[in-house]
C-alpha cells in the first residue's frame, strides 16, 4: 500500500508529519545547518508547494525547478542543474529524513577527488532499499538497487553529493533513474563515488506504515 491511500492527492512533500508538511521538516533542517539557498524539484501539483513556501522560507532563498513531465530521480537533477551556482551540490529525496549534520556533509572532503557521494545506513534486514557495498577506503564498490540477493551491509539513505559537472552527464529531457541507471553507469565508467556511513536515524514516508512511524519519530524534531 502506498502513501496516497492515507494522504490523498496532495504532493508527497506536503503530507503532514508532526503537524507540518514533511518538506518543511527538511527545509528547516537545511536552515539549521546554515544553508542559504535550496532548489526544489517540483512537478505534480507544484502550485501547492510554491504557494505554501514562496520564494523564501526559514532564512533561505527558494528556487523551483519545474518538471512538466516525469523525469525520474536523475532527470530531475539534470533539469535543475542550470540553477546550481556552486561547484558541488547536495541532493536529497523529498520523502526521507536522516538526522545527520548536512552542513558538515556538504563541506566534508570538498577537495578530494570523489565525483559523487551518497549517505549510507546499515541495512538491518531491509529488503526494499538500494543495497550498497563499500570498499575499505570508503569508495562504493557496488550499487544494486532493491536486489535482496546483494549481500551488502548498507542501504541508500537518499542523500547525495555531486560535483556539479556530474549533473550534466545525465541525459536531458527524459525520465532517468539515479539509482538504477546513472549510479551503476558511473561506477562502470570508473567514477569515484564515496559512501558516507551514518549510524543514526533514517526515516521515509513512502508507505502508510512508515508514515505513521515518522509521525512519532519527528514529533520532537526542532521546529523553530
Language-model segments: residues:
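N-proximal low-complexity "stem/linker" segments adjacent to membrane-targeting elements
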Residues: 1-7, 13-14
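A structural signal for short hydrophobic beta-strand segments in well-ordered beta-sheet cores
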Residues: 14, 132-134, 183, 195
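Residue-level signal for inorganic ion chemistry
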Residues: 23, 49, 80, 95, ...
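Short, high-confidence coil segments that cap the C-terminus of an alpha-helix
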Residues: 35, 86, 113-114, 190-191
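Catalytic-core segments of class I nucleotidyltransferases/pyrophosphorylases
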Residues: 89-90, 97, 103-110, 123-126, ...
Amino acid at each position: 500500500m502506498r502513501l496516497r491511500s492515507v494522504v490523498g492527492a496532495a504532493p508527497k512533500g506536503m503530507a503532514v508529519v508532526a503537524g507540518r508538511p514533511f518538506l518543511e521538516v527538511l527545509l528547516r533542517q537545511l536552515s539549521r545547518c546554515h544553508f542559504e539557498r535550496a532548489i526544489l524539484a517540483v512537478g505534480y501539483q507544484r502550485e501547492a508547494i510554491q504557494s505554501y513556501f514562496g520564494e523564501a522560507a526559514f532564512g533561505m532563498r527558494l528556487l523551483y525547478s519545474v518538471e512538466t513531465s516525469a523525469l525520474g530521480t536523475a532527470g530531475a537533477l539534470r533539469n535543475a542543474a542550470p540553477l546550481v551556482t556552486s561547484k558541488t551540490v547536495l541532493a536529497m529525496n523529498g520523502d526521507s529524513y536522516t538526522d545527520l549534520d548536512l552542513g558538515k556533509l556538504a563541506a566534508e572532503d570538498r577537495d578530494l577527488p570523489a565525483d559523487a557521494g551518497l549517505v549510507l545506513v546499515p541495512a538491518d534486514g531491509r529488503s526494499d532499499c538500494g543495497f550498497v557495498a563499500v570498499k575499505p577506503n570508503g569508495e562504493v564498490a557496488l550499487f544494486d538497487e532493491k536486489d535482496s540477493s546483494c549481500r551488502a551491509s548498507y542501504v541508500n539513505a537518499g542523500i547525495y553529493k555531486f560535483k556539479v559537472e556530474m549533473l550534466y552527464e545525465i541525459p536531458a529531457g527524459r525520465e532517468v533513474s539515479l539509482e538504477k541507471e546513472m549510479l551503476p553507469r558511473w561506477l562502470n565508467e570508473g567514477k569515484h563515488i564515496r559512501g558516507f556511513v551514518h549510524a543514526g536515524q533514517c526515516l521515509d514516508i513512502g508507505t502508510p506504515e512508515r508514515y505513521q512511524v515518522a509521525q512519532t519519530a519527528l514529533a520532537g524534531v526542532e521546529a523553530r
